[in-house]
Amino acid sequence: MKAIVFDLGITMKDVVERPINKDYVMVSPSLVLLTGIENAIYTGFLWVEPKRILGSTGIVKVRNAGIEVDKNIEGKKAIVLPYSKKYGGIGTEIDGILAENAVVPSDSLVILPNDYDVKYILYPFVSIGLQLRKIVRGFNVLIIGGGLVSYISALTLVGYANRIYLYNDDGYKVRLYGVEEVKDGGNWDIVFAGSMRSWIRILLQLGSKEGDILALPRFLNSWPSIIPTRLNVKFIEPIKMDGVFDYIEDEISDKLFNELVVSSDSLEASIPTPKPGVILNAEKIFMS
């Protein structure tokens, strides 16, 4: 079968179809969301094993379920979260969804309603932001990074955090109401590091106090390899939870969605991503 793999670069290759383990499902990808994870692999910042099938998150159709998985989900559309609590990072530590017939852990699936909107592809990042609300309520928070998890988390915290600061040293920027851009020091109680590339450097540059809360999105078990011991670290996983679909419907406008992501039919034009996210039409990629 055809798959997009890491092999001294990101390329399409013919690979052997993977077996369906007892708690896995076989899926066919419809739309794959390329993000900072794939950018980090492309630039060499994030190492993955050679021949690893990429694709951390997106919309898929469930084809077959393993023997320990409910058969009723077969034939349904689902979101694949970029992290499995049992097996680790999808498309990084285990094979991802950029294959004609991909296999992923069943605990990474969120079944979609029949009338789903393409904006639901942002589900993993919204789930992280909604969980962050419990940590930052009433506090000042600094968000580091210019990717989807940073911008969407900032958006979800408006009205919950006291003040929201965003440090983004990437070229592409999106303005959000209630979010202040910073380039130097400030007064915050909590740091959310949404950048895989430079968050430690920025923490040192902007300053952080012993005991400050450092919140990190959990996309891999093996990242980060270094954590400042003087900080109170909290990991936040993308999870299935109530309220995510409603939040996307009510708060993420078409205008904002189109500022954050762009659609593409070409792998070559999609990595590195020109916006925080690229929605790759996997059906067209594998048909060509």
Residue ranges and their predicted role:
Residues 142, 242-288:
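C-terminal hydrophobic helical "lid"/dimerization subdomain
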Residues 9-10, 84, 147-148, 195-198, ...:
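Short beta->alpha connector loops
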Residues 3-5, 141-143, 161-171, 190-194, ...:
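Short, hydrophobic beta-strand segments that form beta-sheet elements in well-ordered domains
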Residues 173-235:
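Glycine-rich cofactor phosphate-binding loops and adjacent beta1-alpha1 units
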Residues 84-85, 169-172, 217-221, 239-241:
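Short, acidic/turn-prone active-site loops that include or flank metal/cofactor-
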Residues 80-139:
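NAD(P)H dinucleotide-binding glycine-rich loop of Rossmann-like/cofactor-binding domains
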Residues 18-33, 43-84:
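Glycine-rich beta-strand-centered segment in the early N-terminal region that forms part
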Residues 118-185:
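Mid-domain Rossmann-like dinucleotide-binding core that forms the NAD(H)/NADP(H) cofactor-binding site
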